[in-house]
Amino acid sequence: AATCGIHVSQGDSVTVVSVGHGVFTHNEQLHEELMKPADQRDSSVIRQSPDQYAKLKIDELRSACAVFGITDVRIIGTTEPFRIYQSPELITKLRDVILEIRPQILITQSPYAPTRHGLQNNSLDDHTEVAHATLEARNLASTPIYGSNIQPHKIAATYFPGVYFEKDQFDFYVDATNWFEKRVEAENAFKSQGHTEEFSRRRIELTLGDTGWFSGTMYAESFVREKAEVVSKITISEHTLKRSKEPPSTHMRRISGLEH
């Protein structure tokens, strides 16, 4: 999220696409009410329709994206929980979005199911299903469509958020220190999920702070490449080069937020 904000601030175009409306996701208010005795429940929450909740979720997503300057937010809409075999047409819809926008970079859910003890997890999950549908749509967008004059489009690079991986699988970090407050603000937009200012701040402190600690900065976001890239020569980022010449005290000050 902060990474997208950084790119928008530098003139790049960012589009956020949500497969579903989030109708059956994180309805914490309904969950809270149903946990109460029947005579103590808030009837307005109990009677809330899926369409009403969907509108609330969409508004929250748009508000969170607006924090980072993202105005192109698209909600495709599909059956929930999303399963490709139930809504295969979604792949074509995603392909059409790709052909319209023609992005150079795709950041999507990880298609790899998290496992324990090296065991294979074959259960279906919204996140991995969206990842597989998106990657299939990306591949379809790069091939000609019979009966159409639309030029195929091949996305140059695909990345997955590091939150779905172990630290030794990260390919690079984006320093998000200057965007910490924006991340908290965006996180706090999801009121329907029970988020509060205190919870949002603590969550970002722990997640971006943990990534920042291991990357040598205060707050960071991590990414995993789908595949290795071909480069014209070996390059070193400005951050990496600068830090190779600094004393230990500077490193500690930066992690403490006293120096950037």
Which role fits each region the language model picked out?
Residues 72, 80-260:
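Metal-dependent de-N-acetylase/amidase catalytic core
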